Amino acid sequence: MSLAQTLRGALLTDFMGAAWIAVREMFRRKATVNYPFEKNPLSPRFRGEHVLRRYPSGEERCIACKLCEAICPAQAITIEAEPREDGARRTTRYDIDMVKCIYCGFCQEACPVDAIVEGPNFEFATETREELFYDKERLLANGDRWERLIAKNLELDAPYR
């Protein structure tokens, strides 16, 4: 053992260095968030729970082009459509199996009228798998609930689309 190692052990420099690091870290700003009481802000591009949007007049936006169904890599979307009296096509059935969904956002990008959008909600835990099978009514209800925030996020994201 050399003299330097003996002095280092006697003066407890390693211990003092570790104690200094512990004290310094104690007063550093916390990196964690006390979820669910605190939440970090979400990006306008955040992809969460799916929604079907309506026009301001109340009519649903979906024109039953089925592009979202065709582009979905997980095959989580099922659409059935019928023509209306005025000749326009509208969906009679629009289902998303959220268990299959991989939240890639392809359905949102493919939609020509911004009818299907992945909204800001990420807290949609359920007790059964059946509750993760979203039908048209539930998707429209999600759209009605989150419309203001979705419209704002789409406006913020517009320069990049």
From Swiss-Prot:
What EC number is given for this enzyme? 7.1.1.-
List residues of the 4Fe-4S ferredoxin-type domain.
53-82, 92-121
Molecular functions per Gene Ontology: 4 iron, 4 sulfur cluster binding; iron ion binding; NADH:ubiquinone reductase (non-electrogenic) activity; quinone binding
Q: Which GO terms describe its biological process?
A: aerobic respiration
For this protein, the record's SUPFAM superfamilies field holds:
4Fe-4S ferredoxins
Tell me how this protein sits in the membrane: Peripheral membrane protein
- InterPro entries, per this entry? 4Fe4S_Fe-S-bd, 4Fe4S_Fe_S_CS, NADH_quinone_OxRdtase_chainI
| Co-factor note (free text) | Binds 2 [4Fe-4S] clusters per subunit.
Catalysed reaction, written as an equation = a quinone + NADH + 5 H(+)(in) = a quinol + NAD(+) + 4 H(+)(out)
What Pfam families has UniProt attached to this entry?
Fer4_7
Q: Indicate whether Cell inner membrane appears among the record's keywords.
A: yes
Record: residues binding [4Fe-4S] cluster 2: C72, C101, C104, C107
Keyword terms, alphabetized: 4Fe-4S, Cell inner membrane, Cell membrane, Iron, Iron-sulfur, Membrane, Metal-binding, NAD, Quinone, Repeat, Translocase, Ubiquinone
Keyword Kinase on this protein? no
**Sequence positions that bind [4Fe-4S] cluster 1:** C62, C65, C68, C111
HAMAP family found in the cross-reference section: NDH1_NuoI
Outline what the protein does. Answer: NDH-1 shuttles electrons from NADH, via FMN and iron-sulfur (Fe-S) centers, to quinones in the respiratory chain. The immediate electron acceptor for the enzyme in this species is believed to be ubiquinone. Couples the redox reaction to proton translocation (for every two electrons transferred, four hydrogen ions are translocated across the cytoplasmic membrane), and thus conserves the redox energy in a proton gradient.
As for family, the record states: Belongs to the complex I 23 kDa subunit family.
Indicate the quaternary assembly: NDH-1 is composed of 14 different subunits. Subunits NuoA, H, J, K, L, M, N constitute the membrane sector of the complex.
Full protein name: NADH-quinone oxidoreductase subunit I
Originating organism: Hyphomonas neptunium (strain ATCC 15444)
The record's gene field reads: nuoI
